[in-house]
Each structure stands twice: as structure tokens, then as C-alpha cells.
């Protein structure tokens, strides 16, 4: 084979191989770039939310979806004992079966169900709450309002997480039960029915998430469980109820501060979960203050990876000297953000305006933890977090009315028509002469006409 032939063969073989290698390298780079981009974009979960039925589409009733997570409401008494109030398996019954048992529900709403999960409230992780919030928003793209059923143990935390993250302004009503579904005197069916009624009424639109048990409606930010067993366990210290369900009416007597911002950008929470991955949700813990409390709990939690810590302090948020020293070290060495709350159950802790310790206002420790956890998922800037706590995290009401705004009553006064009185004109009035009274005429008989009787 001559050298010329060898050169021609090399050109025909090697050049295509070089081109293919170059193309492969380019494809590899593009593939890696796309992979990085895909990793940067959060992988959002998908939910099999039921579509509206054709019957519900044409119905005049509100359509309500019940998003079920389990809890005592869906619990089954053990040994089939209807008097077994405390020994039961939470999250046993399916919500579709429970809703089917509600009498006359078709008089108040068209009800559908979505079974998100079926376990006790304390069994859910923060990542699962991330999914739950997105599921509720997905459901509200179809339905007028949503009821979320959960266990009562951590209901105040789950409901406040939803309040802080659900993007829709439509009503979200959280409910549950203190007694399992199949025992005598269970509160489950009534709570479920009344929650559907509240959601269907539309009266809590723009309120954020509310909690309804025992016929009482509370703001998610304010509500807390106060008793381990009683049916009326939920309360809102300092604030009280938003309203009540008094058959057949749903009565709302006050609104949360957030509702005053309805229809404005300020209404929306800063925590849009669609923009972050669930893996970015940080570890945030709670430390309880007590007499001569040590600092080991703070040091241990920081070592375990906590990015934020809420202290439930004595009185107006006080912590022990050892806890204070551990807190200072955590801030200096790790940049941990702290929120100060009170263990008393009510009262406000005001913010100093600087540093890594933020006043929790009147949030309880469990609520403040959710607020801090979400804040740290979106920023590491403590001043931004402080701003969120002192604005969206408070219930401080500010009402401002544009000076050019004209307020008018919605009551229309009836038009009053005055009677028309026609006065005589001066020209038409003639003076009347005074005529002296005349004596009545008396006819005297004439002599000739007088009859004489002999």
C-alpha cells in the first residue's frame, strides 16, 4: 500500500471519528448542563386530585374537597369496644367512607375527598407537610374550598404551616376529633360536618387557614391545644374565637389581621414552596427554660445541625445564665438564629431590633418554630427574617384609608315626597262685603184672611 493511499484512508476514517468524538463531547456538556439545571429546579410532587363531577359542575351548591391525613377522627376503637375512648388506632378509616356516612351533607355542599395520608398528626415530617401544602393548593385550583382533617396532637403546628404556605385565598378549614369515629359520643362526625359547612360558606376567604372544632372557629396562628382529653381542648389565649357555627348559620365576629390586606400583594405569604426544594427545609428546634436550666440542650442541638432555635422562656422570655451563654456561643460560632417566646401560654415578646435573637411577639413556641423554619428555608439574612416576624408574623392591625376614598352607606334611604299644596293667587281673591245679618221674614196675616169663629 502506497503512502498516498494510506493518507487517503486515514482522512476517510480518522476525520469522521474526530467529528463524532467532538459531537459526543458537546452532547455530554449539554447533558450535564441540563442535569444541573434540572437539579436546581425543585422537583414538585404531583397529586391525583379528583376532578369535579359533571353533576357538581352544574350544581348551585359550593364544592368542597376534604383532604384527609388521618388522626383520631379516622380512628377505630380497639376490640370493637364503642366505650374505648383512649385505646384506639388513629388513621384507620378512609375519608370517602366517613363522608358517605354524614347525613344531609348534600344540603350544604357538594363534597369530594382526597386521601393524602392516614396516620397520627405527630407522625408527619416537615417534608410531608411541604407536600400537604402543595396538595391543598392543587385542590383549590379545582374546588371552592378545602377541609383538612388531621390529628389534634400537632394540629396547631400543621394548621399554621398551611397558613404560612398555602397560596390560594380560598377557605382552608382544619378539623379533627378528640374521640375516635366509632365510639359513643364521638365528636368526629359533627366536627367534619360543621367544617364542611364553614368551608362551603365562603366566610373565611382571605382569612388564611382556620381551625374549627366543637363549633368554634379559630385563626391557625392563635389556636393551641389546652387539654389532653376534653372535647373543648382548643382555645386562642389573648384573642379568642373568630366565630361560631350556630345552626344553621356560620357566624364570624372578627377577622385576623391578614384579612385586612385582602386583594393586595401584602396578603400573600413570603413562603412560596414551589420555589424551593423540600430538602432545603432546615432543622429548627425548641428549648424550654426552667429553674437553673443547663446549656447542654442548646449545644447539643447546634451540634446536631440546628440552624434555628426557639426558646420558650420564663415570664417575658427569660432563660438561665447557662442557656444564655450557650446561645451566645451558638450565634458567634455557627450563626444560629434564635427566636424568644414565653412558656406562660400568652403574652408578647418584643423584638430588640438587632442581633440574632428575634422577639416572637405572641406566637407560642410551636408556632414560632414553624415561622423560623420557613424563614430560614428562604434566606439566611437575619434582618430579612426579623422583618417577616414583625410584619407577616404578627397580628398588629393597621387600617389606612386613602383620603380620596369616599365611604358610603349601603343602606338606601327612601325618597320622601312632600305633599303638593296649591295656594290661591292674590288676583283671584276678591274682597267680601260685610252684610249685616237679616232678620228672618215674618208673614203677618191680613184681617180679611183671618177666620173668625163665633
Regions found by a protein language model. Give the residues of each.
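C-terminal non-catalytic interaction/assembly regions of soluble proteins
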Residues: 52-56, 316-414
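Sec-dependent signal peptide cleavage junction
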Residues: 26-40
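Internal gly/pro-rich beta-alpha loop/helix module
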Residues: 175-247
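Accessory alpha-helical/coil subdomains and C-terminal extensions
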Residues: 61, 67, 77, 94-105, ...
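ATP/NTP phosphate-donor binding region
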Residues: 39-137
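Short Gly/Thr/Asp-enriched flexible loops that form oxyanion-binding sites at enzyme active sites
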Residues: 149-170, 320-328
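Ser/Thr-rich, Proline-interspersed low-complexity disordered segments
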Residues: 38-44, 413-417, 423-454
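Short, acidic/small-residue loops that bind anionic groups at enzyme active sites
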Residues: 159-190, 194-200, 332-342
